[in-house]
């Protein structure tokens, strides 16, 4: 049986047939599955799906670099509450995305560090989304060397040298 480590079953394109899709996944031997949030609405849906399909679906919650405008004290409090639920297994996806540059880079860095620290405090692994920003991401992670949560850099497209550095910091690719 496969374990899908990164799905977006909360995506609106599945609104018409989400439950049928999940049933087909089970029939085809896919699962369990981690459905990954990226903003507060998606996080809410990911948690609801994981609760509805307990033992088969799990959730990851976090604020994606495109949506860092949503991150404030209230959303951080809600994210912390969610990661304490048994169905939530990771904090993410979080990181830096300079490819689309949909949010100011300084705001992305601040949100990344804030969530990284919270994940460490909550002993949650992280799912890192780093796109065209490996230099800045590695600089920020190096500053916290020895004080980082475990995690994975998903959908990796950087250099071999950057991959080796993420690995040396304790992350999986």
Label the model's feature ranges.
Residues 1-173:
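Mid-domain alpha/beta scaffold segments of enzyme catalytic cores
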């Amino acid at each position: 049986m496969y374990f899908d480590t990164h799905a977006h079953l909360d995506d609106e394109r599945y609104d018409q047939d989400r439950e049928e899709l999940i049933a087909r996944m089970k029939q085809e031997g896919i699962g369990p599955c981690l459905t990954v949030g990226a903003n507060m609405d998606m996080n809410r849906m990911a948690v609801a799906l994981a609760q509805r399909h307990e033992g088969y679906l799990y959730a990851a919650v976090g604020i994606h670099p495109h949506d860092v405008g949503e991150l404030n004290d209230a959303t951080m409090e809600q994210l912390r509450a969610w990661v304490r639920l048994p169905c939530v297994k990771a904090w993410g996806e979080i990181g830096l995305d300079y490819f689309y540059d949909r949010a100011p880079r300084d705001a992305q860095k601040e949100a990344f560090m804030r969530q990284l620290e919270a994940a460490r405090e909550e002993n949650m692994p992280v799912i890192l989304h780093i796109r065209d920003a490996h230099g800045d991401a590695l600089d920020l992670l190096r500053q916290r060397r020895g004080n980082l949560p475990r995690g994975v850099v998903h959908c990796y497209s950087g250099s071999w040298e950057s991959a080796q550095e993420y690995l040396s910091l304790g992350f999986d690719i």
